[in-house]
Amino acid sequence: MEVKIEESWKEMLKGEFCKSYFKRLVNFIKNEYKTKKDKIFPSPKLIFNAFDSLPFKDIKIVILGQDPYHGKGQANGLAFSVNSDIKIPPSLQNIFKEIERSLKIKTIPNGDLTRWATQGVFLLNSILTVEEGRPSSHKDIGWEIFTNEVIKIISKNLNNVVFMLWGNFARGKKELIDASKHLILETSHPSPYSAHNGFLGSNHFSQTLKYLKEHNKISIDFQ
């Protein structure tokens, strides 16, 4: 079936788009947008924003989230990211805090992480849509099958990618990644409930920049 997505991704994922689970998923999502109008996030054109913002071959880092923010106006299709006019959520505040601590830089007080995506950071939620006020409402409808395949395709076809797995949900994806050719970084989730259990002080960002340099890749400006 025809899916509107960046061309290099369309080529890599064309096999998935033809599978029966994906067709059922698309039909379900279309019906959700039709019947619940503006209560499904992000907007339809931003569902594949993480893919549209970064061609496949340009991926240097994968940061894995669970599902989109469920507040109105927050989700923009990039994991942990919000639109620029939205207050920065607590988890993202902690991400910025760890960047500042680890890299000794000052971050921009703007929650739109498009500036990271265009440099090579693939901000992937495992579940790509959500209903307003109902976290995980689109769990087990097919998105996890799709995004698990995305992770496996990245692992198989690219080399020396950094995978940042924060929290038990993300860490559960470790088995999908070939650790012999990629760097896997694991710690607690940046949520205020768990950030002090490892995330703050993890040095994931400094480790990532060191790894990119060692493998002759252009660095990322995490400001």
UniProtKB/Swiss-Prot annotation:
Excises uracil residues from the DNA which can arise as a result of misincorporation of dUMP residues by DNA polymerase or due to deamination of cytosine. Pfam families: UDG. The active site is at D67 (proton acceptor). NCBIfam families: PRK05254.1-1, PRK05254.1-2, PRK05254.1-4, PRK05254.1-5, ung. Belongs to the uracil-DNA glycosylase (UDG) superfamily. UNG family. GO terms for biological process: base-excision repair, AP site formation via deaminated base removal. This is Uracil-DNA glycosylase. It comes from the Bacteria. Its EC number is 3.2.2.27. It is found in: Cytoplasm. It catalyses: Hydrolyzes single-stranded DNA or mismatched double-stranded DNA and polynucleotides, releasing free uracil. Keywords: Cytoplasm, DNA damage, DNA repair, Hydrolase. One of its GO terms (molecular function) is uracil DNA N-glycosylase activity. One of its GO terms (cellular component) is cytoplasm. SMART domains: UDG, UreE_C. It comes from Borrelia turicatae (strain 91E135).
